[in-house]
Regions:
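Short loop/edge segments at beta-strand edges and connector loops
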Residues: 31, 84, 118-120, 168-170, ...
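Helical element adjacent to the flavin cofactor pocket in flavoenzyme catalytic cores
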Residues: 138-195
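Dinucleotide-binding Rossmann-like beta1-alpha1 core, especially the glycine-rich loop
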Residues: 46-126, 135, 244
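Glycine-rich FAD pyrophosphate-binding loop
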Residues: 21-43
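Redox-cofactor binding/interface segments in oxidoreductases and associated redox assembly factors
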Residues: 7, 50, 198-199
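Conserved Rossmann-like nucleotide-cofactor binding loop
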Residues: 12, 35, 203
């Protein structure tokens, strides 16, 4: 019986694999695609959130802040691209200033460091191409972006070097409890493990409902569009910019 099976080789699965590789354990990662970072992790904005918008007291709030603090050291250790560009939440109307203040107070309560509300002149100095309608912004210097591919590959490579096994082109079909652990049935056979980590991205609810049908959950996925610009446009926007 395997000690741990991780389902999904995206950034969450590969990061979990790397962390668990610190211990004496037999760890297997199952991935339905042909390589790591082929699902949700390959198609996202790669933002390291500062943690100002997560509801205070939630696990997301705590992990946003903790993850943001840990990211620079991880990037140096594993040699993946990390840009501490900071983030701005831009306010376009005077009547929305109280919302900006609430966001600042929520972030401060969450422990986000360096938060400030800046006015038009400072905002224009930081982002010369920002809309003339912008009147203020919440500045979060701990916000950043990473390369999602490089980060995921770095986690996976480090995990593999420390004994974690990866099996690709293996789609999980069933997960259910057995004596002393769990059975994971796939299109390439069955695997038993003492523990299972569900890191299946937008399909994590499907696996959860297999394992715990009495406590069903549903992930409501969202899809966005990306515009690929020429590299000469790289300085047009200097920070991660959100609209309030």
């Amino acid at each position: 019986m395997t000690d741990v099976i991780i389902i999904g080789a995206g950034v969450s699965g590969c990061a979990s694999a790397r962390e668990l590789a610190r211990y004496k354990a037999d760890i297997l990662v199952l991935e339905k695609e042909e390589d790591v970072c082929c699902g949700t992790s390959k198609a996202n904005s790669a933002i390291v959130h500062a943690g100002f918008d997560a509801a205070h007291g939630t696990l997301m709030a705590r992990l946003n802040v903790e993850g943001s603090k840990r990211m620079p050291a991880l990037a140096r250790e594993l040699d993946f691209a990390y840009d501490p560009c900071g983030s701005l939440v831009v306010c376009l109307q005077e009547e929305d200033l109280p919302k900006l203040q609430q966001l600042y107070e929520n972030g401060t309560a969450n422990g986000v460091e360096g938060l400030r509300i800046i006015r038009r002149d400072e905002l224009k100095a930081m982002e010369p191409n920002i809309s003339d309608d912008a009147i203020a912004a919440l500045w979060a210097p701990t916000g950043a972006i990473v390369c999602p591919f490089g980060m995921t590959y770095a986690f996976a490579e480090n995990a593999a070097k420390n004994g974690v096994r990866f099996q690709f082109d293996t789609a999980v079909q069933k997960v259910y409890p057995i004596q002393g652990g769990w059975r994971v049935e796939t299109d390439r056979g069955s695997y038993d493990a003492r523990l299972v980590v569900n890191a299946a991205g937008v399909y994590a609810d499907v696996l959860h409902n297999m394992a715990a049908p009495a406590q069903p959950m549903q992930i409501i996925a969202r899809r966005g569009d990306y515009f690929l610009l020429d590299h000469t446009a790289g300085d047009h926007v200097r920070h991660t910019v959100f609209q309030l």
